Amino acid sequence: MSRRHRFRLSVIALTAFVGAFAACSSTSAVLPADGLVPLGNWGGDSSAMIVSDTATHLHIACTYGDVSGRIAIDAAGGFDVSGSYMLHAYPITVGPSVPARFVGHLSGSTLTVTAIVNDTTQHTTVTRGPVSVTLGADAKLGPCPICRRPVITKLPAAH
């Protein structure tokens, strides 16, 4: 094999390696096939989220919010959905649940979200976050426990 031929093969191999490395280390989001935030428990620092078929429940520190159903993700991984929020949830719940928007982005198994709360009792807008939660990670909520768990219904065994 000539020296020139070996050089060409080396260049081709190097180009293939660099291309494969770049493809594997890409930061582009891989979105869920159904276009919805994946089901399960999500955890982060001072934050947690539970996603079930019927609701999404988000804790940020000692406050929490709810969205009906699962959150739909757009083609870029973003979302902006309406829900409700409880600004005073621990140690006891005080006040009504108020309207909120949840805005964020899903990248791989990490979701970043900000709650924009319309505090109708104080006539002001309150922002909680942004926080990041990761699917399957433990929540680090300190003294504020997550207050809801997804309801799993099992049918009784047939006899």
Could you say what each language-model-derived stretch is?
Residues 2-14:
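Bacterial N-terminal signal peptides that target proteins for export
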Residues 25-28:
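Bacterial signal peptide processing site
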Residues 20-23:
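C-terminal motif of bacterial Sec signal peptides marking the signal peptidase cleavage site
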Residues 78-88, 116-118:
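Generic short beta-strand segments
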